[in-house]
Design a protein with these regions (language model features):
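Cys-dependent protein tyrosine phosphatase-like superfamily
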Residues: 11-273, 286-393
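C-terminal motif of bacterial Sec signal peptides marking the signal peptidase cleavage site
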Residues: 5-8
């Protein structure tokens, strides 16, 4: 897919450069979504969606990898520069001794970028190239040691606005089972320097599955909040079932949902990274509450949830799939290994907390206020920080 030429046309570069770009986009529009994810996002028929999810389960498509390559000029190291501005103000840089990099997460869908390469030899540089990133809405953050990490932004709300990119990120654990960081140095640089994380919410249960984490792996200057919970119907105070597996809400889980939203109402915590272990069930439940509160449709919330199926986490479907169709009970899994009840959770939310408006957004707001003691002013603060205004479009 090509866009208006901006590279050679904009710069009219006739100078001689010692570094020659092998990857030259010349204003092209590039897609940072894998083809498997892009195809899934475009599907609307439920039978086709069910078949596609089965075929692509654990396909490892939860990544954003864009190659940038060049011919070296004898330099021993190179710096690759990216910026949204022609003069490279506020640039992001990558250092390498190779003649190619795979960008891991700096690009935001819908924006135009400029890039160039410089070397450590005197006068070593390339021409400036440019490209535009196709609107996704999915923005994966690709890590060397992590998976299923993505920006919560990019989804359109039912009143026509968009959830901002770069505010909240979701994913899996950042520490290993021994309690230390399982991230590479480059992963930490992405979180600290490129994404600028200032708050971390840990949804895991202390002493049970959290690897004894007590502070942010991103550094002591990052605000860390433990909010232990279980996902899906466990967030409802009256949830209790006897079979097939006895399950029951604990008051701590509901209180933790409240803690999450108290944390999100404080702008000093942004950008925020929230996670459980796999970034699937507990994380998926909180992502549903956040974007649902902001006004994202149930259809898009469901697609965002099911994107985990393309990662090594696998099988996170709106309901079980039998004979090529989603079952009607809204439960994908209910056994000793896991409990996945996406559509059943939404059904119970609407049954218990629906308001006169009949909207999912208002039902979530009602749940947060009545069950979790989140205030109306906190909800408005979150919306203000997370929703795009007219002058930001």
């Amino acid at each position: 897919m090509m866009a208006l030429c901006m590279g050679a046309c904009s710069f009219g570069d006739s100078e001689s450069h010692s570094i020659v770009l092998d990857t030259e986009y010349q204003g092209a529009t590039i897609d940072i979504c894998s083809s498997a994810v892009r195809n899934y996002l475009n599907l609307t028929d439920e039978k086709e969606i069910a078949a596609y999810l089965v075929d692509n389960n654990r396909s490892g498509q939860d990544y954003m990898m864009t190659k940038f390559a060049w011919e070296g000029d004898g330099s021993t190291s190179y710096t690759v520069h990216f910026s949204e501005k022609k003069d490279f103000v506020d640039e992001v840089t990558y250092e390498t001794e190779d003649t190619a990099i795979y960008n891991q997460g700096v690009f935001v869908p819908g924006r135009t970028y400029y890039w160039k390469v410089t070397g450590d030899a005197q006068g070593s540089d390339s021409k400036v190239d440019t490209f535009t990133v196709l609107d996704a809405p999915v923005r994966y953050i690709t890590m060397e040691e992590g998976f299923n990490i993505r920006d919560l932004g990019g989804w359109k709300t039912e009143d026509g606005r968009m959830v901002k990119y770069g505010q909240i990120y979701r994913g899996g654990r950042m520490n290993n089972r021994g309690g230390n960081t399982g991230l590479s140095d480059e992963d930490l640089r992405v979180f600290r320097d490129l994404l600028g994380i200032r708050g971390e919410i840990d949804l895991r249960i202390a002493g049970h599955d959290d690897g004894n984490q007590t502070m942010s792996v991103f550094g002591s200057n990052v605000n860390y909040r433990k909010a232990p919970m279980q996902g899906y119907n466990y967030i409802f105070p009256n949830f209790k079932q006897e079979s097939p597996i006895p399950r029951e809400c604990q008051s701590e889980f509901v209180a933790s949902v409240g803690e999450v939203f108290h944390f999100l109402a404080d702008q000093n915590n942004y950008p925020v990274y929230f996670h459980c272990n796999a970034g699937a069930d507990r994380t998926g439940t909180i992502a549903f509450l956040i974007n649902g509160l902001l006004g994202v449709s149930e259809e898009d919330l469901t697609k965002d949830f099911e994107l985990t199926s393309f990662s090594q986490g696998g099988r996170r479907w709106r309901s079980d799939i039998v004979n090529g169709e989603f079952t009607a009970n809204g439960v994908m899994q209910d056994d000793h290994d896991n409990y996945v009840a996406w559509r059943h959770m939404i059904e119970q939310l609407m049954n218990q907390y629906e308001t006169e408006s009949g909207t999912l957004s208002d039902a979530i707001a009602n749940y947060l206020q009545t069950a979790c003691h989140v205030t109306e002013s906190e909800i408005e603060m979150i919306k203000e920080m997370m929703l795009e205004n007219e002058n930001e479009k």
